[in-house]
A protein has these predicted regions:
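Short consensus segments that form the blades of beta-propeller domains
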Residues: 2-4, 52-56, 164, 185-192
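Secretome/extracellular-domain signature
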Residues: 3-129, 139, 143-145
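N-terminal targeting/export leaders
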Residues: 121-123, 129, 138, 194, ...
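Extended serine/threonine-enriched, polar tracts that run as long, contiguous segments within proteins
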Residues: 146-165, 178-179, 183
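C-terminal subregion of chymotrypsin/trypsin-like serine protease catalytic domains
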Residues: 178-226
Length: 226
């Protein structure tokens, strides 16, 4: 099987700035997929990018324009966020057709299938895949199954993807949810993909703002734009 991480979202708009104003820019890092037989989704080290949630297949980080330190998500508040392009979720594994959810649009894609179904704060369309982030809430993360070593499961949140054992969540204005695994955790069970994060252009100083969701097969939104 060959599953891909979700394509990143796209955000555009005009920001009027003043002399001496300092803006900090975050360039989003792409998420990860998995190709059978290697690497094993459980065997990969979890790489965590700015705003992305940890998981066996990494979700993509946030691309955005901020007024505060863009290396630490907890340092931000909503008034200091001008624009965000949501990151795609990491893929699932052990079966085909479990791609990571795409970055939004106003709503990130839920993990599973081709990852392009916009679905906010809910389970993904495939078993145990994470939901996409919206403008007001993060995507839902799925349980990791009966593992004594499973990390804490958290849903997506403001500027932060959810955490889990499997498909990593994409970062965004509100991050996606992490993928889980069925409760019986039998060998060969499907591993859920992470949901994508939402994009944002709603700051009052942004004019002519618009967003575009990513596409299946890791194609980013806004690809015709420079």
């Amino acid at each position: 099987y060959n599953n891909t991480g979700g394509g990143g979202g796209f955000a555009t708009g005009t920001l009027a700035v003043t002399g001496g104003q300092v803006l900090r820019i975050s360039a989003g890092e792409g998420g990860y997929g998995v190709i059978n037989p290697s690497p094993n989704p459980q065997g990969q080290s979890a790489t965590e990018f700015f705003g992305a949630g940890p998981g066996s297949t990494g979700g993509a980080g946030i691309a955005g324009v901020f007024t505060t330190n863009s290396s630490t998500p907890t340092c931000h508040s909503a008034p200091g966020v001008y624009m965000v392009a949501g990151g795609g979720g990491g893929s699932g594994g052990f079966a085909s057709g479990i791609d990571g959810g795409v970055g939004g649009g106003t709503i990130g894609g839920a993990g599973g299938g081709d990852g392009a179904t916009a679905q906010a704060n809910n389970n993904g369309p495939q078993e145990c895949s994470g939901g996409g982030g919206s403008q007001t809430a993060g995507g839902q993360s799925l349980a990791a199954g009966p593992q004594t070593s499973a990390p804490q499961i958290t849903n997506g949140a403001f500027l932060q993807g959810g955490s889990g054992s499997y498909g990593g969540a994409g970062g965004g204005y509100y991050g996606g949810g992490a993928g889980g695994r069925p409760g019986n955790q039998s060998p060969g069970d499907r591993v859920g993909a992470g949901g994508g994060g939402s994009s944002y252009v709603g700051h009052p100083q942004i004019t002519c703002g618009s967003t575009e969701a990513g596409e299946a097969c890791m194609s980013s939104g806004g690809s015709p734009d420079p």
